[in-house]
Swiss-Prot record:
<feature type="active site" description="Proton acceptor">
    <location>
        <position position="175"/>
    </location>
</feature>
<protein>
    <recommendedName>
        <fullName>Ribulose bisphosphate carboxylase large chain</fullName>
        <ecNumber>4.1.1.39</ecNumber>
    </recommendedName>
</protein>
<keyword id="KW-0007">Acetylation</keyword>
<dbReference type="InterPro" id="IPR017443">
    <property type="entry name" value="RuBisCO_lsu_fd_N"/>
</dbReference>
<dbReference type="GO" id="GO:0000287">
    <property type="term" value="F:magnesium ion binding"/>
</dbReference>
<dbReference type="InterPro" id="IPR020888">
    <property type="entry name" value="RuBisCO_lsuI"/>
</dbReference>
<keyword id="KW-0602">Photosynthesis</keyword>
<keyword id="KW-0113">Calvin cycle</keyword>
<dbReference type="InterPro" id="IPR036422">
    <property type="entry name" value="RuBisCO_lsu_N_sf"/>
</dbReference>
<feature type="binding site" description="in homodimeric partner">
    <location>
        <position position="123"/>
    </location>
    <ligand>
        <name>substrate</name>
    </ligand>
</feature>
<comment type="similarity">
    <text>Belongs to the RuBisCO large chain family. Type I subfamily.</text>
</comment>
<dbReference type="InterPro" id="IPR020878">
    <property type="entry name" value="RuBisCo_large_chain_AS"/>
</dbReference>
<feature type="modified residue" description="N6-carboxylysine">
    <location>
        <position position="201"/>
    </location>
</feature>
<dbReference type="GO" id="GO:0009853">
    <property type="term" value="P:photorespiration"/>
</dbReference>
<feature type="binding site">
    <location>
        <position position="203"/>
    </location>
    <ligand>
        <name>Mg(2+)</name>
    </ligand>
</feature>
<feature type="binding site" description="via carbamate group">
    <location>
        <position position="201"/>
    </location>
    <ligand>
        <name>Mg(2+)</name>
    </ligand>
</feature>
<keyword id="KW-0460">Magnesium</keyword>
């Protein structure tokens, strides 16, 4: 018998399988300020106690495996293991529990969202003891937050770059999203910016397809931006989607955008991946580019109520990885989003400090210290009649983005942009005068129609549009 084997035998190593809860369920544990805390919605298989299910999540997302192993004796599990420290039943749901897990900070590589997610959600979601598992929220300790650079610029720097204050920013996604030539695409960009929008946008799946290669699109969009700026005296931008098949190609596209002198580029951060996103955010910070983030694929991850990951976790991850804008739902419009829950993660994006508030889906108090904020983008099935509600719900620090609600105007793209700008300015003025947008919104829009035929035409087209499914 080797000396190593004798040593292990002397401390009582016993091969075999034992319950996770014997090691990883620790209700007496007091969390540390440096712990990463996770709130999981756990649905155990029939016959699996919640303590065992919660402990299994803690084990399989940290140091545990299915059986005891010799090498456990070569490290300190008490220092490195995850701990399920509290369990509470979910009100109104049978056999669902919120299990709180604490992870020591040493388990995670500094400045790497990729590593954080690989550990916490990388393997445990397929665990047989669980019918379903959802990560509802994370508390990122300040010690870990400070290892990330975060958004390239943030809200205040963006406003200073654009010289635009006191109102939400206005955007438009160019439609049809696929099939336009680069020149016709640039024409639509110009018309929307000339009509009064601050930004136009590539759709998330516009990359570099045969009908419109990326370099041609970038050139025509830059021409459109420069022409609109010269005619309006306002700083304009178009979210040039730099997402590509490789990180090298993505950075090459961002470099070309910088050389053209445009203010902002775009990335699909979930399909592109967090490593690519963080790399692009670092480039944008170093080279004065704003970074717009689209959340394409998010509903694959976050839509199911008992499995996957809530968008507030993806939003926190984006603030760490880096982005100046991110799509965040609308509350109104065609895409799903509950008001209080949506405002909960909107505050997590913008504010320096957010208090725990379960009514808004916030499980932990979160401090971002000096990390810049991210502008939430409201987009998806919205039009001029929604403007009062959007202004009231999202406030000034937001981007309100109308695709079909601009390009679907009966008189064309520029009048569609005019209608949206007039509606926004009317709502901001009414709010500043003390009027209640929630109660008087339709009246405010109708009053503005009297001196804007473009707005009146838009209101007539979309007066009956509702998304009720």
């Amino acid at each position: 018998m080797s000396p190593q084997t004798e040593t292990k035998a002397s401390v009582g190593f016993k091969a075999g399988v034992k319950d996770y809860k014997l090691t990883y369920y620790t209700p007496e544990y007091e969390t540390l300020d440096t712990d990463i805390l996770a709130a999981f919605r756990v649905s155990p298989q029939p016959g699996v106690p919640p303590e065992e299910a919660g402990a299994a999540v803690a084990a399989e997302s940290s140091t545990g495996t299915w059986t005891t192993v010799w090498t456990d004796g070569l490290t300190s599990l008490d220092r490195y293991k995850g701990r399920c420290y509290h369990i509470e039943p979910v009100a109104g749901e049978e056999n669902q529990y919120i299990c709180y897990v604490a992870y020591p900070l040493d388990l995670f590589e500094e400045g790497s969202v990729t590593n954080m997610f690989t550990s916490i959600v990388g393997n445990v979601f397929g665990f047989k003891a669980l019918r379903a598992l959802r990560l509802e929220d994370l508390r990122i300790p300040v010690a870990y937050v400070k290892t990330f650079l975060g958004p390239p610029h943030g809200i205040q720097v963006e406003r200073d770059k654009l010289n635009k204050y006191g109102r939400p920013l206005l955007g438009c996604t160019i439609k049809p999203k696929l099939g336009l030539s680069a020149k016709n695409y640039g024409r639509a960009v110009y018309e929307c910016l000339r009509g009064g929008l601050d930004f136009t946008k590539d759709d998330e799946n516009v990359n570099s397809q045969p009908f419109m290669r990326w370099r041609d699109r970038f050139l025509f969009c830059a021409e459109a931006i420069n022409k609109a700026q010269a005619e309006t005296g306002e700083i304009k931008g178009h979210y040039l989607n730099a997402t590509a098949g490789t990180c090298e190609e993505m950075i090459k596209r961002a470099v070309f955008a910088r050389e053209l002198g445009v203010p902002i580029v775009m990335h699909d951060y979930l399909t592109g991946g967090f490593t690519a996103n963080t790399s692009l955010a670092h480039y944008c910070r170093d080279n004065g580019l704003l970074l717009h983030i689209h959340r394409a694929m998010h509903a694959v991850i976050d839509r199911q109520k008992n499995h996957g990951m809530h968008f507030r976790v993806l939003a926190k991850a984006l603030r760490l990885s880096g982005g100046d804008h991110i799509h965040a739902g609308t509350v109104v419009g065609k895409l799903e989003g509950e008001r209080e829950i949506t405002l909960g993660f909107v505050d997590l994006l913008r504010d320096d400090f957010t208090e725990k508030d379960r009514s808004r889906g916030i499980y932990f108090t979160q401090s971002w210290v000096s990390t810049p904020g991210v502008l939430p983008v409201a987009s998806g099935g919205i039009h001029v009649w929604h403007m009062p509600a959007l202004t009231e719900i999202f406030g000034d620090d937001s981007v309100l983005q109308f695709g079909g609600g601009t390009l679907g105007h009966p008189w064309g793209n520029a009048p569609g942009a005019v209608a949206n700008r007039v509606a926004l300015e009317a709502c901001v003025q009414a709010r500043n005068e003390g009027r209640d947008l929630a109660r008087e919104g339709n009246t405010i829009i109708r009053e503005a129609c009297k001196w804007s035929p473009e707005l009146a035409a838009a209101c007539e087209v979309w007066k009956e549009i509702k998304f009720e499914f």
